[in-house]
From Swiss-Prot:
Molecular function in Gene Ontology: catalase activity; heme binding; metal ion binding
Protein name: Catalase-peroxidase
Catalytic machinery residues: H92
Site (Transition state stabilizer): R88
Keyword annotations: Heme, Hydrogen peroxide, Iron, Metal-binding, Oxidoreductase, Peroxidase
Family classification: Belongs to the peroxidase family. Peroxidase/catalase subfamily.
Positions bearing the Tryptophyl-tyrosyl-methioninium (Tyr-Met) (with W-91) cross-link: Y243-M269
Subunit and interaction comment: Homodimer or homotetramer.
PROSITE patterns listed in its UniProt record: PEROXIDASE_1, PEROXIDASE_2, PEROXIDASE_4
Residue sites binding heme b per the record: H284
Co-factor binding comment: Binds 1 heme b (iron(II)-protoporphyrin IX) group per dimer.
């Protein structure tokens, strides 16, 4: 045998000690290159919207309805109906959404991939997706997994007698796990020590991004749990859960304490108390939980399972391992006498009985109705009946005083429950889809909802090229500076989040509460700029014929374009910034202030802005912002350098403006940052602001933040800066800046995409 044959082959590509092993805090630029075309197997010209429009949705729903009662021996349906399993699948696909950063949710079909496919809260959902495969296989790319998971939940409800509010397609699949979502920093499943141990804030030791305050440490926890402070932006109380522990906080079976966790986690998913009660009660009208035996009978999750299991996990050695022997959550609860039929049985049982604490066969805390007969059907043996049971979190709806009032109203008014659940379910499953312009299909509801951030439909002729040129001249002659115009346009457009497709310049909500008062937008300067632009708008619209108008939303973006063209001209470059009119102005009545408040940037490195102190360094928060703006590393780099040259910053400090000719679109930021004649030193132990002095004379040249200096410190970013700092780079710099700028301005223009 040759020496090569004897030698163990341990140098496969990607193996060995990695850069992240050596430097775990290294900046995560890879967050800006995920979901590229290299991971997508579909043809480059594939258009999912067109494919979905060709889909026979009624035929898909018919096939799904047939599947509901087509019980398979390898995974038998509880009560002969897969509906409850598919409701849980859809709920858990959508329920990872959190309003804080818009990440999570159903929009990209991420339940197929790690870590979600292996979360403890998603046990057995691998089987649900395998049950769906024949239907996905039949319709191919006309319906994404992301859409199919949600549609299946709707059909499940409808086949059990519930009238849903509607369904919209349009969720495009991704083909690899999300890298940007911070799920927490615990190292064990169901851990919660970090998200609560550090108060309201946490830091991701693995180099990911988290925006969280430094404050709120170690408060005393009261009986109602109000002293618990879940770190932002997390929406679950333990690693691997969707929301809360159904046994109660950390397994403590206290309904009142559990109510605090429910309220906090559902609020972070943008749900109010009524929506929360409706969702829990509506969901628990159907099906059951599974805890037939001890958890040590359950094998590894899908990502840790053996190859021969073919992506299925949690192999169960208890009894038959399925059907009546299923172990999922460890709880063994069936809520109603009709678990495959819509009704008000959940609330009827909740208030009819007094409840005693007991344990499931798996040893989990749950509740059984005191002095109750056996009225609940068995999921797999029609000859057996069971006593009514509830979860600790179910009892929260009765014993929390606010939830109790809502619950009693729903008990007495089943029609109100049905309407509230239908609307809350639609919101749950569509919250991360963005505006209605992205909705596809014949079942899109006609009603416009404020949480969709509605914008009026275009109702007037648009400005033409001649109008645009004239308006640019008026804007530049208005007395507003280049930096003021660019700052305002950036502030308007950069609220966009690629995560949940919210924000952006369309709607001109920058002139409305709460955006007009955000510190990052410099309210006094903003009011001045808006007043001037409103005057130009009024004058222009007042002399047009045929109903032609320009919206303030368009004029804000056009002002930024005019200013950039002027700044490029000052640098000796002629450039035309792309501009597509058609934005409309939203009203204050169309703006949910509390919901829009979640879009406020706590950090915007492009404007050198930090609202507070965060454990994540400023440069990591820049990556977070760039990722939400769907920018690549080169786009982020050229945008930041250009904005610094244009003197765009929040507040009075001019950190990072490394140029002696501000408001000129030059590559000075890069040239001066890379100048070895400058020596940098921190101004304080916090190391958040630095001064750059001439190495020979000691003369102060510049001041900069961590965000500025990372472009010279980080090897990859420095390599990008070197491109734009080169002698032959000015033209390329302007061209690339304009392209990246135009991309940001149009991120929310789904109607023209």
């Amino acid at each position: 045998m040759s020496s090569e044959a004897k030698c163990p082959f341990n140098h496969a590509a990607g193996g060995g000690t990695t850069n992240r092993d050596w430097w775990p805090k290294q900046l995560r630029l890879d967050l800006l290159s995920q979901h590229s075309g290299k991971s997508n197997p579909l043809d480059g010209g594939f258009n999912y919207a067109e494919a979905f429009r060709s889909l026979d949705l009624a035929a898909v729903k018919k096939d799904l309805a047939a599947l509901m009662t087509d019980s398979q021996d390898w995974w038998p349906a509880d009560f002969g109906h897969y509906g409850p399993l598919f409701i849980r699948m859809a709920w858990h696909s959508a329920g990872t959404y959190r309003i804080g950063d818009g990440r999570g949710g159903a929009g990209r079909g991420q339940q197929r991939f790690a870590p979600l496919n292996s979360w403890p809260d998603n046990v057995s959902l691998d089987k649900a997706r395998r049950l769906l495969w024949p239907i996905k296989q039949k319709y191919g790319q006309k319906i994404s997994w992301a859409d199919l998971l949600i549609l299946t939940g709707n059909v499940a409800l409808e086949t059990m007698g519930f009238k849903t509010f509607g369904f919209a397609g349009g969720r495009e699949d991704t083909w690899e796990p999300d890298l940007d979502v911070y799920w927490g920093n615990e190292k064990t499943w169901l851990g919660g020590d970090v998200r609560y141990g550090k108060g309201a804030a946490g830091d991701n030791d693995d180099g990911g991004v988290i925006v969280a305050d430094e404050e709120k440490h170690g408060e005393e926890v009261s009986r109602d749990n109000s002293g618990r402070n879940l770190e932002n932006p997390l929406g679950a109380v333990q690693m691997g859960l969707i929301y809360v522990n159904p046994e109660g906080p950390d397994g403590n079976p206290d309904p009142l304490a559990a109510a605090h966790d429910i309220r906090e986690t559902f609020a972070r998913m943008a749900m109010n108390d009524e929506e929360t009660v409706a969702l829990i009660a509506g969901g628990h009208t159907f099906g059951k939980t599974h805890g037939a035996g001890p958890a040590d009978n359950v094998g590894p999750e899908p990502e840790a399972a053996d190859l021969e299991n073919q992506g299925l996990g949690w192999k169960n050695s208890f009894g038959t391992g399925k059907g009546a022997d299923t172990i999922t959550s460890g709880l063994e609860v069936t809520w109603t006498t009709t678990p495959t039929k819509w009704g008000n049985g959940f609330f009827e049982n909740l208030f009819k009985y007094e409840w005693e604490l007991t344990k499931s066969p798996a040893g989990a805390h749950q509740w059984v109705a005191r002095d109750a007969g056996e009225t609940i059907p068995h999921a797999h043996d029609p000859s057996k009946k069971l006593r009514p049971t509830m979860l600790t979190t179910d009892l929260s709806l009765r014993f929390d005083p606010v939830y109790e009032k809502i619950s009693r109203r729903f008990l007495e008014n089943p029609d109100q429950l049905a309407d509230a659940f239908a609307r809350a379910w639609f919101k749950l499953t569509h919250r991360d889809m963005g505006p209605r312009a992205r909705y596809l299909g014949p079942e899109v509801p006609a009603e416009e909802l404020n949480w969709q951030d509605p914008i009026p439909a275009l109702d007037h002729p648009l400005v033409n090229e001649q109008d645009i040129a004239s308006l640019k001249q008026k804007i530049l002659a208005s007395g507003l500076s280049v930096s003021q115009l660019v700052s305002t346009a950036w502030a308007s457009a950069s609220t966009f989040r690629g995560s949940d497709k919210r924000g952006g310049a369309n709607g001109a909500r920058i002139r409305l509460a709460p955006q007009k008062d955000w510190p990052v937008n410099q309210p006094e300067q903003l009011a001045k700029v808006l007043k001037v632009l409103e005057g130009i708008q009024s004058e222009f619209n007042g002399v047009q014929s045929g109903g032609k108008k320009i919206s303030l939303a368009d004029l804000i973006v056009l002002g930024g374009a005019a200013a950039i063209e002027q700044a490029a001209k000052s640098a000796g470059q002629q450039v035309s910034v792309p501009f597509s009119p058609g934005r409309m102005d939203a009203s204050q009545e169309q703006t949910d202030v509390q919901s829009v408040a979640a879009l406020e940037p706590l950090a915007d490195g492009f404007r050198n802005y930090l609202k507070g102190k965060y454990r994540a360094p400023a440069e990591a928060l820049l990556i977070d912002k760039a990722q939400l703006l769907t920018l690549t590393a080169p786009e982020m780099t050229v945008l930041l350098g250009g904005l610094r040259a244009l003197n765009v910053h929040a507040g009075q400090d001019s950190h990072g403006v490394f140029t002696h000719r501000p408001q000129t679109l030059s590559n000075d930021f890069f040239r001066n940052l890379l100048d070895m004649g400058t020596e940098w030193k921190p101004l304080s132990p916090a190391r958040d602001v630095f001064e750059g002095r001439d190495r020979k004379t000691g003369e102060l040249k510049w001041t900069g933040t961590r965000v500025d200096l990372v472009f010279g410190s980080h090897a990859q970013l420095r390599a990008l800066c070197e491109v734009y700092a080169s002698e032959d780079a000015q033209e390329k710099f302007v061209r690339d800046f304009v392209a990246a700028w135009a991309k940001v301005m149009d991120l929310d223009r789904f109607e023209i995409a």
